């Protein structure tokens, strides 16, 4: 799910002390071989999509500093690495992996902390406290307002069902409605691009829930 013109074959220049491309290649390989095949939504394809969107958003938001762009890109590629270890609390696990791994690639303690702050900001409810964190948060959930929302959300439904985290379609639509109601985009670029479509999608889901029949043949009140 890569955006044309925003792919991963155009690496960002990094300060020489950081072996960023090697760090990125390492985690992509780890995700490719280590993620569960039942991560239908949170697979490698999601990480690559988020990375591409994050870099596109950074350009649109006027981020030009080479180090900032490199740290954002690294954070995007590592933001779901915690799924290699756990499902619940994967953000914290991802940060632990970052702290263990990235010193070997020349990242300083301060750079690693900046990456972890970005990763932890993606934990729900999102609480980004910097421009880079806002960009990563918006990239992570960019699909909520995109034309490919349906197939992507279906993959999440399949993933949650496989883990028995939701019982049926009605619970799924309730979950979606609650999530879309409380979610917000952070960057001006994403608000302009995605917010209206996301709201229209929420309106359709709420209408669907309102028309959902009870077992007795009556309709739900939502």
Summary of predicted features, one role per range:
Residues 5, 35-64, 78, 107, ...:
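Divalent metal-dependent phosphate-bond-processing catalytic cores, especially two-metal-ion Mg2+/Mn2+ enzymes
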Residues 24, 28, 51, 55, ...:
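An amphipathic alpha-helix signature
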Residues 15-33, 46:
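Short alpha-helical hairpin
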Residues 2-22, 220-222:
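Non-catalytic interface/linker regions that flank or bridge core catalytic/transmembrane domains
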Residues 50, 67-85, 90, 94, ...:
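His-Asp-centered metal-binding catalytic motifs of divalent-metal-dependent phosphohydrolases/nucleases
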Residues 101-107:
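Post-HExxH zinc-binding segment in Zn-dependent metallohydrolases
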Residues 40, 84, 88, 105:
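Short gly/ser-rich anion-binding loops that grip negatively charged ligand groups
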